[in-house]
Amino acid sequence: MSERIEIPAEKLHEEMLKLRQGKHMDFLRSLTGMDWGEEGLGVVYHLEDTNTRENIVVSTRTTNREKPELPSVSDIWKGAEFNEREVYDYYGIRFIGHPDMRRLFLRDDWVGYPLRKDYDESLNPLRMTNEEPVDTTQYIEVQHDGSVIEKRETIFDEDEYIINIGPQHPATHGVLRFRVSLEGEIIKKLDVHCGYIHRGIEKMCESLTYPQTLALTDRLDYLGAHQNRHALCMCIEQAMGVEVSERVQYIRTIMDELQRIDSHLLFFSCLCMDMGALTAFFYGFRDREKILDIFEATTGGRLIQNYNTIGGVQADIAPDFVQKVKEFIAYLRPMLKEYHEVFTGNVIAQERLKGVGVLSREDAISFGATGGTGRASGWACDVRKRHPYAMYGKVDFKEIVHTEGDCFARYMVRMEEILESMDIIEQLIDNIPEGNYQEKMKPIIRVPEGNYYAAVEGSRGEFGVYLESRGDKFPYRMKFRATGLPLVSAMETMCRNAKIADLIAIGGTVDYVVPDIDR
């Protein structure tokens, strides 16, 4: 169990700095906005010491619902900047000392704050017009006399040369927009615009029963749908004290690793296409089809499987599942060597990727950039090793870590992880025990009152679920720690002083999925 601390708002920044420096809580795992009704509006922080893996949960609140304000911690953890903007967007809490207090997902002309419990949906009818572009942001600071003042600051100066990459650009891999300030071909500033595919999934969860919420996780990172749902099921099961059978743990682990291979093959294909290597693009898609066939035979779905459920999985594995998985692994190993011959060793690929988009280990931790991006920067951040779940504590595998922090390191981490995923599957596939594939659950699932957090290692990093329950059949608050939001928050750091063409390579190797960012 994690240690839990409540800190008064006026002491928050001081105490958080002590936790960061004194207790080495250098990783901000999750930052969640909350509406506790009459008890006020607030934030829950999940912190971790990357050396000892000790976790602390911190909460703070303000009772001023008319003009809620809390100190910003974005100067302590860089990843807090986008997370605090999200909280402002959803709850209207303004963070004093935050450098860019704009909405993150919603339009600037949006009325109200949708995750507040007293939010009135009628205030925002469907708009049929574009929003007016705004090139300013607000900065809130405390004066020496204790008064709070607001400042308006311009994001880009009038004499800066600005171009838009996205939201309708093939290399952004979805509806994401980068506003880029250029000096010649050199990137001087990058402003990320999210929210084009925001669907209000966390708000929707509050009016759904727990089994109904499961389908929404598949609509986040759709290339890690099985892993996302695994995290949510695990969070609910742990909260209820439900132990799934060992057979289920084996199946979930194997399916998670097949999903990881599937995602990394797609990463390889898309990066090759971005770099102009069309032949290699087809190689990855050709081989990925074999995994989708395996998924379809057992789950009925290819891209989105709808397979995990509370207490187990929806159906037992297909009769030929074991055979097909073993055949696929035997097929893919020699194919990976071919990938490296076609693309990895190519001099153009190496020139485009090596030394480009460098992210230091310290910045990776500060931004919370987990997954292949963090491990390429020398940070051993794999949830399967840090906090083992399912069968990961009983299998032998190597955590792939590189230290260069550039595009080529991020590429190689993912390619080498395919081999590790195959090794994990081979240790399990012939030893799946007999047993139930689903535990018997009550018709109406009620999670005991309390706060819960569970995380898995998704294809792009830590995917976490924070759940607050009041003992009802609906979640009081369900927050998803998207793997992609910390990644895009680090994009400006990686792109600054790079060439505009390098933006494509950097975005491709970061490997974000836009619906996962926007939720």
UniProtKB/Swiss-Prot annotation:
Localisation: Cell inner membrane
Region (NADH dehydrogenase I subunit D) residue spans: 159-519
UniProt cross-references to SUPFAM superfamilies, sorted A to Z: HydB/Nqo4-like, Nqo5-like
Main location: membrane
Provenance organism: Phocaeicola vulgatus (strain ATCC 8482 / DSM 1447 / JCM 5826 / CCUG 4940 / NBRC 14291 / NCTC 11154)
Superkingdom of the organism of origin: Bacteria
One Pfam family it belongs to: Complex1_30kDa
EC number: 7.1.1.-
This protein's name: NADH-quinone oxidoreductase subunit C/D
